[in-house]
Amino acid sequence: MESLQQLQQQLGLMAWPLFICSALTVMLLAERLFQVLLSLTVGKGAIRHALQATSPKNPKQLAELTEHFASKRPVLYRGVAMLLAHHQFDKSLREDAAGIWLQEQRHQFNSGLRLLTLIGVISPLLGLLGTVLGLIEMFKGVAATTGSITPNVLADGLGVAMYTTAAGLLIAVPAVAGAQLLSLWADRTMAKLEHTLNYVNLWLEGMTLHADASLTVVTPQEATTENL
């Protein structure tokens, strides 16, 4: 409690606005980093390995795989489970469903990033405002002094001016850097989701894309033989 009062004295009128910006930055970064950790627990290789052990023409295997993926927390698993749950629909309808789902995920990934960027812009301005207010207080102290001007007369005003500037920059740097890094992560994750869902959609049609960009097509006769 004493440290909070000390910070209020050091930051002056800009203390609570800077406290609020700092708290919002910490909460948004923590929530976004938690989302990042959830998405880092699975790769496309795990999805492909599971699909290789399943026939796209076997409804029972598809239902089991859908249930298995739906029980997982990573967003990539949930996206594949959503697509597998619509395996009985035409390819175009599955693409529409995947497009809607991807839009929702993009909105979720980018939520809070604009607010982080806004905090990164506002915080230095709040610090600058605190600097101006601190200088005003300093000049008031100088004007009220009848004798010689000593460093003690200037200390309070200059202290508020410097502290608010430093606090604003300390909040702005992680806010802006975090917003930019999380935006890059969101774009990379969305590209990964789109690629995986396209792969699964082709797999449901009996086509498999290999690492060398070649396609393997499973004909209905081959699928029937495999199921038997």
Swiss-Prot record:
Keyword Protein transport recorded: yes
Name of one Pfam family that matches: MotA_ExbB
Gene Ontology biological process terms, A to Z: protein import
Residue ranges crossing the lipid bilayer per the database entry: 11-31, 116-136, 158-178
Domain of life: Bacteria
Location of this chain's protein in the cell: Cell inner membrane
Topology of the protein relative to the lipid bilayer: Multi-pass membrane protein
Keywords: Cell inner membrane, Cell membrane, Membrane, Protein transport, Transmembrane, Transmembrane helix, Transport
One GO CC annotation: plasma membrane
Function: Involved in the TonB-dependent energy-dependent transport of various receptor-bound substrates. Protects ExbD from proteolytic degradation and functionally stabilizes TonB.
Quaternary state and interactors: The accessory proteins ExbB and ExbD seem to form a complex with TonB.
Family, as annotated: Belongs to the ExbB/TolQ family.
Protein name (record): Biopolymer transport protein exbB1
Species, as recorded: Vibrio cholerae serotype O1 (strain ATCC 39315 / El Tor Inaba N16961)
Protein's gene: exbB1
